[in-house]
């Protein structure tokens, strides 16, 4: 089943992921110093060792149009690490969602 885990607190950027049968062993938060807001869904491709080998921001559900937020989300997604699975497909596709929020 699809696993969704959430981390973060409002104002610092919430995160969640979906990658069937895998747990996140590292899910870095993006660093950003901006008042821009929105959600960026990054489509990820993960190898059997748990490494993210490809990431494309702007997947279905993305609300942020700012390219800076999308770039930061992609950078963080490429650093994510998931549990290895020898039974997984050679490349398993999932998503990581980053919610960039600020409060004035």
Model-derived regions: residue spans:
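A short, well-structured alpha-helical segment
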Residues: 18-19, 33-41, 45-92
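Short, low-complexity, Pro/Ser/Thr/Gly-rich segments in the mature regions of secreted, periplasmic
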Residues: 97-103
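Acidic, low-complexity proline/glycine/alanine-rich linker and hinge segments
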Residues: 1-33, 71-79
